[in-house]
Amino acid sequence: MEGKIKIGPVGTDYSGKKTMVDWDEGSHNGIISQIFLSHGPTGVFSIQFQFMLDDTFFLSSCHGQNTGSMFDVILLNCPHEYITGISGEYLKSDGASGPQIRSLAFATNLNQYGPFGGSSSQSSIWNHEQQFRFKLGKFRQFSGFYGTYNASGLQNIGVYLQPTIVKPTGTRNAEETESNIVLG
């Protein structure tokens, strides 16, 4: 993806296994209107997105299976609400069965959603769980998700960031500011 920064993925890397399915939703413009999650006490089983492009809505493929005991829909106030971060927990053990992405939470410029999936009240030390947090800034820089899944659930997840050019709002240039700081 030209001009985009690929962040992650977090989770387990089973790249040599034939049962893994790679997915990539980074070619969209990053304007997500809905996120669909199947999850349960052991983690996230599937994730799916609805994107908006030129006032038309497109549904992505379902990445995983909707076999969790819980299903949630995150409805964003599109196009005014946009993703500014993603966080959660993943299992850092290549031999474990089940979803390796244990929980997911999403931050937008307007709200916080989640966590969805396994309870963080379980001991992370004994379960080999690791926390992650991708903060994408306060501007609309999110550009998509990617990851892998298998029959057990979501195995890893990452995000794309499209850097935004931000111009300084002050009238002074950097040299003037620096000289005022140094000289008082």
From Swiss-Prot:
<protein>
    <recommendedName>
        <fullName>Jacalin-related lectin 2</fullName>
    </recommendedName>
</protein>
<dbReference type="Pfam" id="PF01419">
    <property type="entry name" value="Jacalin"/>
</dbReference>
<comment type="similarity">
    <text>Belongs to the jacalin lectin family.</text>
</comment>
<dbReference type="GO" id="GO:0030246">
    <property type="term" value="F:carbohydrate binding"/>
</dbReference>
<dbReference type="InterPro" id="IPR036404">
    <property type="entry name" value="Jacalin-like_lectin_dom_sf"/>
</dbReference>
<keyword id="KW-0430">Lectin</keyword>
<feature type="domain" description="Jacalin-type lectin">
    <location>
        <begin position="4"/>
        <end position="163"/>
    </location>
</feature>
<dbReference type="InterPro" id="IPR001229">
    <property type="entry name" value="Jacalin-like_lectin_dom"/>
</dbReference>
